[in-house]
Amino acid sequence: MRGKTQEDIGLVELLDPVAESVGYEIVRLRLMGGAEQRRLQIMAERPDGDMNVEDCAKLSRAISEILDAADPISGEYTLEVSSPGVDRPLTRLKDFETYAGLEVRIELDRVAEGRKRFKGELAGVEDGQVGLNLEGEDDTTVYFPFEWIVDAKLVLTDQLMKRGAEQRAARVGAEGEDANEDLGDDAEDDIDLSESEED
């Protein structure tokens, strides 16, 4: 699901080791457009789930080098590297576990329970099957093999926004603690010194 076409899948296989070598995971890759205006769109993240502008630039440089050397795409194209965003696609089995409890839209490659498209709350993963509590149907949980899923995306809700804000706050807090630990015992003195310079 990280790649949609055979060409996408081949590019994922080529670029996965490059992304991992610089500390990122490819969430989704799509080669879009016609022969004249192609666009290679890559969504990626760090293992902690974050991805800022500097991360995108770093990964873009690493990917560009291998694409220039291997030349797997015929003709001209534009490379776009971005974060998956808040209402992100879910493309790996672990995503369905990580985001359990949140609202999601899922599309299957076949009919199940009389339809291909579903909306509901993720119920996690059990034996390689993705669980979904169906919207508007009390106590109805359905399970699909991960391989049946062709598209899945989180639904933008207040709960999702709150969770995203909490995760960002936790990361910022952890980064601040790491910075103070790196400074050692002089951390408070350094802060006091900089404050006195502003007066």
UniProtKB/Swiss-Prot annotation:
Cited Gene3D superfamilies: Ribosome maturation factor RimP, C-terminal domain, RimP-like superfamily, N-terminal
Keywords (A to Z) from UniProt: Cytoplasm, Ribosome biogenesis
GO biological process: ribosomal small subunit assembly; translation
One GO term describing the cellular component: cytosol
Composition bias, Acidic residues: 175-199
Annotated spans, Disordered: 166-199
Stretch forming the signal peptide: none
CDD domains: YlxS_C
Major localization class: cytoplasm
Family classification: Belongs to the RimP family.
Classification via PANTHER family: RIBOSOME MATURATION FACTOR RIMP (PTHR33867:SF1)
UniProt-listed NCBIfam families: PRK00092.2-5 (NF000932)
Name this polypeptide is given: Ribosome maturation factor RimP
